[in-house]
Design a protein with these regions (language model features):
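Glycine/threonine-rich flexible loop motifs
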Residues: 195-197
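Glycine- and other small-residue-rich loops at beta-strand/loop junctions that grip anionic moieties
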Residues: 64, 186-190, 210, 243, ...
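Short phosphate-binding/catalytic loops that engage adenosine nucleotides
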Residues: 140, 206, 230
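Segments forming oxygen-rich coordination pockets for charged ligands
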Residues: 1-165, 174-183, 217, 223-224, ...
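ADP-ribose/adenylate-binding Rossmann-like module
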Residues: 145, 183-184, 188-189, 199-224
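Adenosine-phosphate binding glycine-rich loop
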Residues: 212-275
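A general structural motif
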Residues: 164-170, 176, 188-192
C-alpha cells in the first residue's frame, strides 16, 4: 500500500515535469533536463528527473542536497555552452566529512533544449509572407507585427506563432516583451511604418535588423532618427540594402536573399552585401 502511494507521488511529479516542458517549448525558453541513469547501492535515490532553467530554477529532483546543487550548476553551464552530456558525481568523501549515512556515486545525463531563434516580421505584405514561410523551414519562431486591419492579413496572422497588432510601434513592441537577440525584418506598408518600427527596434538589443528600401528612403529615415537622438552607432546596426545581391525581383526571391543574410548573421558566416 505504501509503495503504491509513493508510486502515485512519482507519477504526479513526472506529469508536472512534462507540463513544465510543454510550457517551456510554447514560450520558447532554454532549459536542460537532468536524468539519473546510474547509481551505486549507497545512493539514497536511484531514479529521478529534474528540469533546470538557465537562471537556476528547477522542477523535479535528482536527490536534493549538495549533489542536486552541483547538478543544477552543471545544467546551467550546459545551457550556457549548448553542450550537455554524461556527468558523474561521487558523494562518498563529502558524506564522510559531514557524518552522513548516505553517500554513493551517481551518473546523470544532462540534455540541453535550446530555444528557437526568433524572427520578428514587421510587415505582413508579400515579402513578409514569403519570409515567414521560409524562416519557419529553417527553425525560426515567427512573430508578426503589423498595423493593418486584421481581416486583410488573416492568412499571415494564422501562419505566425504569435501576432502583435500595432497601433503604436514603440508602445506595442515594448509591451510585447520580445526576447533579446531576436532577428527583425522591417517591410511595412509605407516608409512611416518602417521608420516607427526601426525606432522601436533599435533599443531592443537585436541580433539583426534589416529594412527594405532604396537609398532615398533609407537616407530620409536615418535623418529623421538622427534628429530624434539616435546615434550613428545605432543606425550602423541596420542591414540596408537588405539581403544578398542575387538579382532578386519577385517577393519570393527577395525573401530568399533576406533569409540568407539573416542566417549568415545567425551562424556567423558569409558576407552580406552592405559590408
Amino acid at each position: 500500500m505504501a509503495d503504491n502511494r509513493w508510486q502515485g507521488m512519482e507519477d504526479l511529479s513526472y506529469v508536472r515535469l512534462l507540463e513544465e516542458q510543454l510550457c517551456a517549448h510554447r514560450e520558447n525558453v532554454n532549459y536542460a533536463l537532468a536524468t539519473i541513469v546510474d547509481t551505486d547501492q549507497n545512493t539514497a535515490r536511484t531514479q529521478g528527473k529534474m528540469m533546470v532553467y538557465e537562471n537556476g530554477a528547477a522542477v523535479g529532483t535528482v536527490g536534493g542536497g549538495a549533489l542536486e546543487t552541483k547538478v543544477i550548476h552543471d545544467a546551467c553551464q550546459a545551457i550556457s555552452t549548448g553542450r550537455g552530456g554524461l556527468f558523474h558525481y561521487n558523494m562518498n568523501s563529502q558524506a564522510a566529512r559531514e557524518g552522513l549515512a548516505c553517500g554513493g556515486s551517481m551518473s546523470v545525463f544532462i540534455e540541453v533544449y535550446a530555444s528557437r531563434p526568433v524572427l520578428v516580421m514587421c510587415g505582413a505584405g508579400h515579402v513578409g509572407g514569403c519570409m515567414m514561410r521560409l524562416a519557419r523551414l529553417t527553425g525560426f519562431q515567427i512573430i508578426l507585427a503589423d498595423e493593418r486591419p486584421e481581416a486583410l492579413i488573416a492568412d499571415k496572422i494564422n501562419a505566425a506563432d504569435r501576432y502583435i497588432p500595432i497601433k503604436n510601434y514603440e508602445e506595442d513592441l515594448g509591451k510585447a516583451r520580445l526576447p533579446q537577440g531576436a532577428f527583425y525584418v522591417l517591410a511595412g506598408p509605407n516608409h512611416d511604418a518602417d521608420r516607427k518600427a526601426l525606432a522601436a527596434v533599435l533599443n531592443a538589443s537585436p541580433a539583426y535588423v534589416g529594412m527594405i528600401g532604396g537609398k532615398p528612403k533609407i537616407t530620409a529615415i536615418f535623418e529623421k532618427l538622427h534628429a530624434m537622438g539616435y546615434s550613428q552607432e545605432q543606425l550602423d546596426q541596420v542591414y540596408t540594402p537588405i539581403g544578398l545581391d542575387v538579382g532578386n525581383e519577385t517577393p519570393e526571391e527577395i525573401a530568399v536573399s533576406i533569409l540568407a543574410e539573416v542566417l549568415m548573421v545567425k551562424n556567423k558566416k558569409g558576407r552580406p552585401q552592405n559590408v
